[in-house]
Design a protein with these regions (language model features):
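The two-metal-ion catalytic cores of nucleic-acid processing enzymes
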Residues: 1-330
């Protein structure tokens, strides 16, 4: 599907066909970075994927070259070095000289097989009263820091065939910072209406804006399973960079997940076909997309006296919702 070459003018932030049939080059404004687990040589390895958008509105994912998670230990005794080198989760170690607390000190760099093992090793070492450095950085951020990347990057590599993905994927051979630019984002906003008696879905309405221009609007109704299937299909079709709505973190997304489970379905909203994932702080993670709850942003930026959708719409847009009695919705 993506056998053409892609190249860009420096700083243009877009892509175009080139003469090479395999190599591609693109400049992206990054949306987010996500850790994916892949089986490489029979072992689960974490690989960072960068998601972004070009200046001319093409969303893409970048599979980076695998790199091991790592941290540093300040002046570990020889007995601890031996234990680390023999540990099943430790991939490799090497000595380093680092500037710590105003002086140069002997340290040990510890590379592990999986980032999920770093907290366990970190806590074990700290329990032995050792100083551990760089062990609190999420793995996908670690990749960005280690490669000195900013908000925009230029990537060169080959297009990868990824079944179930809603955007093209580049396998990065080289990755470098690029001149800053603003990319037009595709934003999907949705709202769910449901029964107050048994929580059944009545309908789901959505709109899609691309670069600020309305390009699609749709109302999904009928049976619950059909509404959920049509919604996930709409996400895959329109491939939004941002999913938004009013209180979707606290209501709409949890409700959709609840009703999907009731029907033996999964809420597949990620660009890689993965499920939406609710975090412990009530926010949601969708791979390759930004979930931006309008309620949280209004609360943080505007701090309105009243936080209801009706009050905020009136304050910002000069419009109010249709006056529907919730008790009569069923």
């Amino acid at each position: 599907l993506w056998s053409l070459s892609v190249s860009v003018t420096r700083g243009a932030g877009g892509y175009k066909a080139g003469p090479d049939s395999e190599r591609v080059r693109a400049t992206l404004r990054l949306l987010n970075a996500v850790s994916h687990t892949e089986v490489i040589d029979g072992r689960n390895i974490t690989v960072v994927y960068l998601y972004g958008r070009t200046a001319d509105g093409q969303s893409m994912a970048v599979r980076t070259e695998p790199q091991p998670p790592w941290f540093q230990v300040v002046e570990p005794p020889d007995t601890m070095v031996a234990q680390l080198e023999a540990h099943a989760e430790v991939r490799a170690t090497r000595p380093e000289r680092l500037w710590v607390d105003g002086t140069e000190r002997d340290c040990l760099r510890v590379e592990v097989w999986h980032p999920g093992k770093v907290p366990q090793l970190r806590d074990w070492l700290r329990a032995s009263e050792l100083v551990v450095l760089a062990a609190d950085i999420p793995f996908h951020f670690r990749y960005i820091y280690d490669h000195d990347l900013g908000g925009c990057v230029t990537v060169e590599g080959e297009m990868l065939e990824k079944r179930g993905w809603s955007c093209p994927v580049i396998g990065a051979a080289t990755l470098a910072p690029a001149e800053t630019f603003t990319a037009p984002l595709r934003v999907l906003s949705f709202d769910v209406e449901n029964s107050l008696l048994d929580r059944r879905l009545f309908c789901l309405c959505l709109t899609v804006h691309d670069g600020g221009e309305l390009v699609a609007e749709q109302m999904l109704d009928g049976g619950e399973a059909g509404i959920i299937a049509s919604f996930t299909a709409a996400i895959a079709k329109h491939d939004p960079d941002v999913i938004t709505g009013y209180n979707i973190d606290g209501y709409d997304l949890p409700l959709l997940e609840e009703r999907a489970k009731l029907h033996g379905m999964k809420l597949m909203l990620g660009r890689d076909g993965s499920e939406a994932d609710q975090r412990s702080n009530r926010t949601w993670a969708v791979r390759g997309r930004v979930v931006a709850d309008a309620w949280w942003n209004v609360k943080r930026e505007i701090r309105p006296r009243q936080e209801s959708l009706n009050a905020v719409a009136k304050q910002l847009l000069g419009r109010e919702k249709h006056d529907v009695n919730p008790q009569q919705m069923d």
